[in-house]
Amino acid sequence: MTDLKTTFAGLQLKNPIIISSSGLTNSAGKNKKLAEAGAGAIVLKSLFEEQILIEADQLKDPTYSEGNDYLADYIREHKLAEYLELIKESKKVCDIPIIASINCYTDTEWIDFAKQMEEAGADALEINILAVQSDIQYKYGSFEQRHIDILSHIKKVVKIPVIMKLGDNLTNPVALIDQLYANGAAAVVL
């Protein structure tokens, strides 16, 4: 049989088939089946901070503002704990790299989520930056700079490879990709 071994983002893969973040990768059981079917690596379904915030917002009680803060913290911790457990369980049942994927809205969450995912055993991190800008005052080029800033902050706190996932709303993707690699990205994906 042909040897399909390759390297991606510094990770050794038995083949170049990487299962992307989706509903197919949201449980350790599914991930085990994907690994057994021959996947070279798995990107877990993304954890979206925005979804956590929306869920907390939907449960707000306007008559008890203090309780809303506790509720938001509880939901955040619960969702993050579930995701960290997904990493740990997937690592137990898979013999291939497990890549955590995060999409955060606030700068502090990127760093906190990244550290905890590395500690949970993720082999690499995919940073999914997707934000639709509707503010007319938003400075041209700020979105691209945000990618570089987030990467730089995360690289300071984790040792595992950081993969940057780009959306389709960039003014100059080639220049941004060059800057991401120059600032330590292990890989860039679309």
Q: What are the roles of these predicted feature ranges?
A:
Residues 1, 16-19, 74-76, 139-140, ...:
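Short linear motifs at secondary-structure transitions and domain/linker junctions
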Residues 27-65, 78-99, 103-190:
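Alpha/beta enzyme core
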Residues 15-31:
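N-terminal binding-site loop/beta-alpha segment at the start of enzyme catalytic domains
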Residues 67-74:
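Short glycine/proline- and acidic residue-enriched helix-loop micro-motifs
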Residues 2-11, 22, 45, 57, ...:
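Flexible, active-site-adjacent loop/turn segments at secondary-structure boundaries
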Residues 1-18, 83-91:
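N-terminal amphipathic alpha-helix/helix-capping segment at the start of soluble metabolic enzymes
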